[in-house]
Amino acid sequence: MNLLEKTRKINAMLQNAAGKPVNFKEMAETLCEVIEANVFVLSRRGKLLGFAIKQTIENERMKKMLADRQFPEEYTKNLFNITETSPNLDINSEYTAFPVENKDLFKNGLTTIVPIIGGGERLGTLILSRLDKEFHDDDLILAEYGATVVGMEILREKAEEIEEEARSKAVVQMAISSLSYSELEAIEHIFEELDGTEGLLVASKIADRVGITRSVIVNALRKLESAGVIESRSLGMKGTYIKVLNDKFLTELEKLKHH
Protein backbone atom coordinates (compact mmCIF):
# COMPACT_ATOMS: atom_id res chain seq x y z
CA MET A 1 0.00 0.00 0.00
CA ASN A 2 1.36 3.42 -0.90
CA LEU A 3 0.69 6.62 1.08
CA LEU A 4 -2.37 7.53 -0.99
CA GLU A 5 -3.95 4.09 -0.51
CA LYS A 6 -3.24 4.22 3.21
CA THR A 7 -4.78 7.69 3.50
CA ARG A 8 -7.83 6.43 1.61
CA LYS A 9 -8.15 3.59 4.09
CA ILE A 10 -8.41 6.11 6.95
CA ASN A 11 -10.87 8.19 4.88
CA ALA A 12 -13.01 5.12 4.19
CA MET A 13 -13.27 4.49 7.94
CA LEU A 14 -14.32 8.12 8.51
CA GLN A 15 -16.84 8.05 5.66
CA ASN A 16 -18.39 4.86 7.03
CA ALA A 17 -18.87 6.67 10.34
CA ALA A 18 -20.86 9.36 8.42
CA GLY A 19 -22.31 11.58 11.13
CA LYS A 20 -21.90 8.96 13.85
CA PRO A 21 -19.17 9.37 16.45
CA VAL A 22 -15.79 8.05 15.30
CA ASN A 23 -14.94 4.96 17.28
CA PHE A 24 -11.47 5.42 18.82
CA LYS A 25 -10.89 1.67 18.79
CA GLU A 26 -11.62 1.52 15.04
CA MET A 27 -9.37 4.51 14.48
CA ALA A 28 -6.54 2.77 16.37
CA GLU A 29 -7.10 -0.45 14.41
CA THR A 30 -7.01 1.38 11.06
CA LEU A 31 -3.81 3.25 12.00
CA CYS A 32 -2.31 0.00 13.27
CA GLU A 33 -3.02 -1.61 9.91
CA VAL A 34 -1.67 1.20 7.70
CA ILE A 35 1.34 2.15 9.85
CA GLU A 36 2.06 -1.42 11.02
CA ALA A 37 2.68 -0.46 14.63
CA ASN A 38 1.06 -0.73 18.05
CA VAL A 39 -1.27 2.25 18.45
CA PHE A 40 -2.49 3.85 21.69
CA VAL A 41 -4.93 6.77 21.81
CA LEU A 42 -4.67 8.51 25.20
CA SER A 43 -6.81 11.21 26.76
CA ARG A 44 -5.24 14.13 28.66
CA ARG A 45 -5.43 12.14 31.89
CA GLY A 46 -3.96 8.97 30.43
CA LYS A 47 -7.23 7.11 29.88
CA LEU A 48 -6.87 4.68 26.99
CA LEU A 49 -9.59 5.72 24.54
CA GLY A 50 -8.62 3.10 21.98
CA PHE A 51 -5.72 0.84 21.10
CA ALA A 52 -4.62 -1.80 18.61
CA ILE A 53 -1.72 -4.19 18.94
CA LYS A 54 0.45 -5.30 16.01
CA GLN A 55 3.27 -6.87 18.03
CA THR A 56 2.23 -8.45 21.32
CA ILE A 57 4.29 -7.34 24.30
CA GLU A 58 4.53 -10.12 26.86
CA ASN A 59 4.71 -8.08 30.03
CA GLU A 60 2.34 -8.21 33.00
CA ARG A 61 2.46 -4.47 33.73
CA MET A 62 1.61 -3.62 30.11
CA LYS A 63 -1.20 -6.19 30.07
CA LYS A 64 -2.66 -4.66 33.23
CA MET A 65 -2.48 -1.15 31.73
CA LEU A 66 -4.42 -2.31 28.69
CA ALA A 67 -6.97 -4.20 30.81
CA ASP A 68 -7.46 -1.15 33.10
CA ARG A 69 -7.42 1.18 30.07
CA GLN A 70 -5.20 3.58 31.99
CA PHE A 71 -1.58 4.66 31.51
CA PRO A 72 0.52 5.67 34.57
CA GLU A 73 -0.06 9.21 35.85
CA GLU A 74 3.62 10.18 35.84
CA TYR A 75 4.10 9.00 32.25
CA THR A 76 0.95 10.83 31.09
CA LYS A 77 2.07 14.08 32.77
CA ASN A 78 5.47 13.88 31.08
CA LEU A 79 3.83 13.53 27.66
CA PHE A 80 2.75 17.18 27.96
CA ASN A 81 6.42 18.14 27.56
CA ILE A 82 6.17 16.90 23.98
CA THR A 83 4.51 19.62 21.94
CA GLU A 84 5.20 18.31 18.44
CA THR A 85 5.63 14.92 16.80
CA SER A 86 8.67 13.12 18.25
CA PRO A 87 9.57 10.08 16.15
CA ASN A 88 11.76 7.03 16.82
CA LEU A 89 12.43 7.43 20.54
CA ASP A 90 14.49 4.46 21.73
CA ILE A 91 14.05 2.19 24.74
CA ASN A 92 16.14 4.57 26.90
CA SER A 93 13.73 7.47 26.38
CA GLU A 94 11.40 8.28 29.28
CA TYR A 95 8.61 8.28 26.69
CA THR A 96 9.17 4.74 25.44
CA ALA A 97 6.01 2.67 25.12
CA PHE A 98 7.98 -0.51 25.78
CA PRO A 99 8.46 -1.93 29.30
CA VAL A 100 11.84 -0.67 30.52
CA GLU A 101 12.12 -3.61 32.93
CA ASN A 102 12.58 -5.82 29.83
CA LYS A 103 15.10 -3.54 28.12
CA ASP A 104 17.10 -6.44 26.70
CA LEU A 105 14.02 -7.89 24.97
CA PHE A 106 12.96 -4.56 23.50
CA LYS A 107 16.33 -2.91 22.85
CA ASN A 108 15.22 -2.26 19.25
CA GLY A 109 11.86 -0.86 20.33
CA LEU A 110 10.99 2.52 18.78
CA THR A 111 8.25 4.87 19.97
CA THR A 112 6.68 7.85 18.22
CA ILE A 113 4.68 10.42 20.18
CA VAL A 114 2.11 12.61 18.40
CA PRO A 115 0.29 15.29 20.46
CA ILE A 116 -3.48 15.44 19.86
CA ILE A 117 -4.44 19.12 19.66
CA GLY A 118 -7.81 20.70 18.93
CA GLY A 119 -9.29 24.14 19.48
CA GLY A 120 -5.86 25.37 20.55
CA GLU A 121 -5.56 22.99 23.51
CA ARG A 122 -3.89 19.67 24.21
CA LEU A 123 -6.58 16.98 24.20
CA GLY A 124 -4.49 13.84 24.40
CA THR A 125 -1.64 11.90 22.81
CA LEU A 126 -1.28 9.34 20.05
CA ILE A 127 1.48 6.81 20.77
CA LEU A 128 2.92 4.45 18.16
CA SER A 129 5.45 1.72 18.88
CA ARG A 130 7.15 -1.05 16.95
CA LEU A 131 10.30 -3.15 16.93
CA ASP A 132 13.29 -2.77 14.59
CA LYS A 133 11.67 -0.72 11.82
CA GLU A 134 12.05 3.07 11.98
CA PHE A 135 9.07 5.38 11.50
CA HIS A 136 9.47 7.33 8.25
CA ASP A 137 7.78 10.46 6.89
CA ASP A 138 4.86 8.52 5.38
CA ASP A 139 4.14 6.94 8.78
CA LEU A 140 4.28 10.35 10.46
CA ILE A 141 1.93 11.94 7.90
CA LEU A 142 -0.63 9.19 8.60
CA ALA A 143 -0.11 9.46 12.37
CA GLU A 144 -0.59 13.24 12.36
CA TYR A 145 -3.67 12.89 10.17
CA GLY A 146 -5.04 10.31 12.62
CA ALA A 147 -4.26 12.58 15.59
CA THR A 148 -6.12 15.47 13.91
CA VAL A 149 -9.20 13.30 13.38
CA VAL A 150 -9.11 12.09 16.99
CA GLY A 151 -8.74 15.71 18.18
CA MET A 152 -11.81 16.78 16.21
CA GLU A 153 -13.77 13.86 17.61
CA ILE A 154 -12.81 14.68 21.22
CA LEU A 155 -13.87 18.31 20.62
CA ARG A 156 -17.20 17.14 19.19
CA GLU A 157 -17.82 14.94 22.25
CA LYS A 158 -16.97 17.86 24.54
CA ALA A 159 -19.39 20.14 22.70
CA GLU A 160 -22.12 17.50 23.03
CA GLU A 161 -21.47 17.19 26.77
CA ILE A 162 -21.73 20.98 27.20
CA GLU A 163 -24.95 21.00 25.17
CA GLU A 164 -26.43 18.15 27.21
CA GLU A 165 -25.45 19.93 30.42
CA ALA A 166 -27.17 23.14 29.29
CA ARG A 167 -30.27 21.21 28.22
CA SER A 168 -30.54 19.42 31.59
CA LYS A 169 -30.21 22.72 33.41
CA ALA A 170 -32.86 24.42 31.25
CA VAL A 171 -35.34 21.56 31.81
CA VAL A 172 -34.87 21.82 35.57
CA GLN A 173 -35.27 25.60 35.59
CA MET A 174 -38.47 25.37 33.55
CA ALA A 175 -39.87 22.64 35.81
CA ILE A 176 -39.11 24.65 38.95
CA SER A 177 -40.58 27.85 37.50
CA SER A 178 -43.83 25.98 36.73
CA LEU A 179 -44.36 25.36 40.48
CA SER A 180 -46.56 27.66 42.53
CA TYR A 181 -45.13 29.17 45.71
CA SER A 182 -46.71 26.53 47.96
CA GLU A 183 -45.68 23.70 45.59
CA LEU A 184 -42.09 24.93 45.62
CA GLU A 185 -42.19 25.06 49.42
CA ALA A 186 -43.52 21.49 49.45
CA ILE A 187 -40.75 20.31 47.11
CA GLU A 188 -38.06 21.93 49.27
CA HIS A 189 -39.38 20.07 52.33
CA ILE A 190 -39.67 16.79 50.43
CA PHE A 191 -36.04 16.82 49.33
CA GLU A 192 -34.83 17.93 52.74
CA GLU A 193 -36.61 14.86 54.06
CA LEU A 194 -35.16 12.57 51.37
CA ASP A 195 -31.60 13.81 51.94
CA GLY A 196 -30.29 12.27 48.72
CA THR A 197 -31.37 11.41 45.21
CA GLU A 198 -33.91 8.74 46.08
CA GLY A 199 -36.02 7.43 48.93
CA LEU A 200 -39.43 6.92 50.48
CA LEU A 201 -41.75 9.74 51.34
CA VAL A 202 -45.02 9.82 53.25
CA ALA A 203 -46.88 12.81 51.77
CA SER A 204 -49.44 13.14 54.58
CA LYS A 205 -46.68 13.46 57.20
CA ILE A 206 -45.00 16.30 55.31
CA ALA A 207 -48.37 17.96 54.64
CA ASP A 208 -49.16 17.96 58.36
CA ARG A 209 -45.76 19.18 59.40
CA VAL A 210 -45.52 22.01 56.88
CA GLY A 211 -49.18 22.93 57.06
CA ILE A 212 -50.12 22.38 53.40
CA THR A 213 -52.63 20.06 51.80
CA ARG A 214 -51.61 16.68 50.46
CA SER A 215 -52.88 17.67 47.00
CA VAL A 216 -50.25 20.44 46.79
CA ILE A 217 -47.53 17.81 47.27
CA VAL A 218 -49.11 15.49 44.70
CA ASN A 219 -49.39 18.30 42.13
CA ALA A 220 -45.81 19.42 42.69
CA LEU A 221 -44.48 15.88 42.22
CA ARG A 222 -46.63 15.41 39.12
CA LYS A 223 -45.21 18.57 37.51
CA LEU A 224 -41.63 17.47 38.16
CA GLU A 225 -42.38 13.98 36.89
CA SER A 226 -43.95 15.18 33.65
CA ALA A 227 -40.81 17.28 33.03
CA GLY A 228 -38.71 14.13 33.43
CA VAL A 229 -36.89 15.56 36.44
CA ILE A 230 -37.99 12.85 38.88
CA GLU A 231 -39.85 9.57 38.85
CA SER A 232 -42.28 8.58 41.58
CA ARG A 233 -44.07 5.36 42.38
CA SER A 234 -46.82 4.85 44.93
CA LEU A 235 -46.14 2.03 47.40
CA GLY A 236 -49.57 2.20 49.02
CA MET A 237 -49.49 2.57 52.80
CA LYS A 238 -45.69 2.74 52.85
CA GLY A 239 -45.73 6.04 50.96
CA THR A 240 -44.26 7.18 47.66
CA TYR A 241 -40.89 6.15 46.27
CA ILE A 242 -39.09 9.11 44.65
CA LYS A 243 -35.97 9.12 42.50
CA VAL A 244 -34.21 12.16 40.98
CA LEU A 245 -33.47 11.56 37.28
CA ASN A 246 -31.87 14.90 36.41
CA ASP A 247 -28.64 15.51 38.32
CA LYS A 248 -28.99 19.31 37.97
CA PHE A 249 -32.23 19.35 40.00
CA LEU A 250 -30.85 19.25 43.54
CA THR A 251 -28.19 21.87 42.70
CA GLU A 252 -30.80 24.28 41.33
CA LEU A 253 -33.08 23.65 44.32
CA GLU A 254 -30.19 24.38 46.67
CA LYS A 255 -29.51 27.68 44.85
CA LEU A 256 -33.13 28.77 45.34
CA LYS A 257 -32.89 28.22 49.09
CA HIS A 258 -29.98 30.62 49.36
CA HIS A 259 -31.66 33.40 47.39
Swiss-Prot record:
- For region GAF domain, the annotated ranges are 1-155
Transcription regulation as UniProt keyword: yes
Instruction: List the GO molecular function terms.
Output: DNA binding; DNA-binding transcription factor activity; GTP binding
Q: What Gene Ontology terms for biological process does this UniProt record contain? A: negative regulation of DNA-templated transcription
* InterPro entries in the cross-refs: CodY (IPR014154), GAF-like_dom_sf (IPR029016), GTP_trans_reg_CodY_C (IPR013198), Transc_reg_CodY_N (IPR010312), WH-like_DNA-bd_sf (IPR036388), WH_DNA-bd_sf (IPR036390)
**One GO CC term of this entry?**
cytoplasm
Please give the family membership noted in the entry: Belongs to the CodY family.
What the protein does?
Answer: DNA-binding global transcriptional regulator which is involved in the adaptive response to starvation and acts by directly or indirectly controlling the expression of numerous genes in response to nutrient availability. During rapid exponential growth, CodY is highly active and represses genes whose products allow adaptation to nutrient depletion.
Record's protein name: Global transcriptional regulator CodY
